[in-house]
């Protein structure tokens, strides 16, 4: 299972709310892309609503902050905007709210898991 209030728990819960499949344990945030590939899911750099958005260890999260150097980060795409940016929902102990929401402008720089 996933630790309380962490990004992985939120991604699991949100995809469940959306009636989208997600494995019971995909690893740490940065691991979701490789785990999904191993399970036969498509992983690429094209966002779509409901996709798990994967941030590598230490990767900039839209220029706002940096994903954890040990665990990385994972979020869920809520909307793809006309300008190519994405609105994401995310969890993690560093946020004041659970979930938190933010817009990422350089959406093509990240990996997306398409279940």
Model-derived segments and spans:
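Secreted/periplasmic proteins that engage bacterial cell-wall peptidoglycan
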Residues: 1-82, 89-90
């Amino acid at each position: 299972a996933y630790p309380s209030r962490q990004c992985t728990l939120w991604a699991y819960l949100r995809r469940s709310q959306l009636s989208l499949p997600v494995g019971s344990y995909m690893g740490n945030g940065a691991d979701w892309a490789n785990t999904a590939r191993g399970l036969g899911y498509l992983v690429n750099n094209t966002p779509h609503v409901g996709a798990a958005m994967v941030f590598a260890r230490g990767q900039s999260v839209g220029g706002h902050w940096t994903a954890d150097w040990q665990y990385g980060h994972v979020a869920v795409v809520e909307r793809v905007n006309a300008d190519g940016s994405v609105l994401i929902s995310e969890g993690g102990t560093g946020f004041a709210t659970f979930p938190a929401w933010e817009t990422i402008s350089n959406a093509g720089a990240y990996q997306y898991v398409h279940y």
